[in-house]
């Protein structure tokens, strides 16, 4: 049978989700835990591949296994006891045999957190930026993103990508006492896309670029035309949605 694992992780201590030959990844740690508990190799296929230092409040991965009578009900508890403190399992859901954690996802939502003050407790969970930002201009620019579908200008260079088309359905900045949060939802994202978008919008907020410039940047399809890529530690994958009919 096929199952979806729902889980969270702090990405600080990991070189991203995907297994790496000479570095520790979230996938490696979770697969090792599953193999130890279930006494057989359990390959995981996740909804996406977060980069080094990126966090996930909600992530899904699918796997196949024929559970014994009492194994399934205990697995979430056992995994949480076995895994390190920075990975937490939330649920185990039975899905249809063809359900795919990556390809069946309808949407993904990311948040990027910027702090306007120094904090010794949260420096691995946000990007520190003390300059004042023009949020009104940044939100005008965020709306521009939803007018386009080709985001090659925000894609990491020299990556094997079949299509640069993404449908962004929400993009907005909010302000709090602690700083700024950017929330963006799309059906899919390119590698490094959110961090490049945030860096570009920050440059607009600092008046280094204009909202009108953003149209030209997107139309150029040139990564060097866009802004800088902000650091990974402020980025969180926060929500993934699936068709209800996948779940049994």
Please identify what each model-predicted range represents.
Residues 1-248:
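Structured-RNA-binding interfaces characteristic of tRNA pseudouridine synthases
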């Amino acid at each position: 049978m096929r199952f979806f694992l729902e889980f969270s992780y702090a990405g600080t201590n990991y070189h991203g989700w995907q297994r790496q030959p000479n570095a520790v990844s979230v996938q490696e740690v979770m697969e090792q835990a599953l193999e130890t508990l279930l006494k057989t190799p359990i390959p995981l296929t996740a909804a996406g591949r977060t980069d080094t230092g990126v966090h996930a409040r909600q992530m899904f991965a699918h796997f196949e296994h024929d559970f014994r009578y009492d194994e399934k009900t205990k697995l979430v508890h056992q995994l949480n006891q076995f895994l390190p403190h920075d990975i937490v399992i939330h649920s185990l859901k039975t899905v249809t045999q063809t359900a795919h954690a990556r390809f069946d996802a309808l949407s993904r939502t990311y948040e990027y957190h910027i702090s306007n003050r120094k904090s010794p407790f949260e420096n691995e969970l946000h990007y520190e930026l003390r300059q004042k930002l023009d949020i009104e201009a940044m939100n005008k620019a965020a709306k521009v993103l939803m007018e386009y579908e080709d985001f090659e200008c925000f894609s990491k260079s020299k990556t094997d990508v079949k299509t640069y088309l993404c449908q962004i359905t929400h993009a907005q900045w909010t302000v709090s006492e602690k700083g700024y949060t950017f929330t963006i939802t799309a059906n899919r994202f390119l590698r490094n896309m959110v961090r490049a978008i945030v860096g570009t919008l920050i440059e607009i907020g600092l008046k280094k670029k204009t909202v009108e410039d953003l149209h030209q940047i997107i139309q150029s399809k040139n990564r060097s035309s866009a802004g800088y890529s902000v650091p990974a530690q402020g980025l969180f994958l926060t929500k993934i949605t699936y068709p209800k009919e996948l779940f049994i």
